[in-house]
């Protein structure tokens, strides 16, 4: 059984008990540590909001994704 959420406006199914860390890892294709940084030490370069509230990187691992959640994953870009 899966849970349906929206990620950047697109419906997506995830496993029950999934966290923001799990979702970011799946979307970026990178292993993410519990501190929200890439395991390989490189920058992840994304910010996450769950139901219009920003989720601090340090809380990704403990923030569960539940049915009906609307998740926005924004990629950071340089510029001015």
Question: What is the predicted role of each segment?
Answer:
Residues 1-79:
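Ubiquitin-like/PB1-type beta-grasp interaction modules and other compact soluble beta-rich domains
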């Amino acid at each position: 059984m899966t849970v349906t959420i929206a990620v950047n406006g697109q419906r997506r199914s995830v496993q029950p008990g999934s966290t923001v860390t799990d979702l970011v890892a799946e979307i970026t294709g990178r292993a993410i540590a519990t501190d929200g940084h890439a395991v390989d030490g490189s920058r992840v370069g994304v910010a996450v909001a769950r139901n219009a509230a920003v989720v601090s990187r340090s809380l990704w691992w403990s923030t569960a994704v539940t049915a009906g959640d609307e998740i926005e994953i924004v990629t950071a870009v340089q510029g001015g």
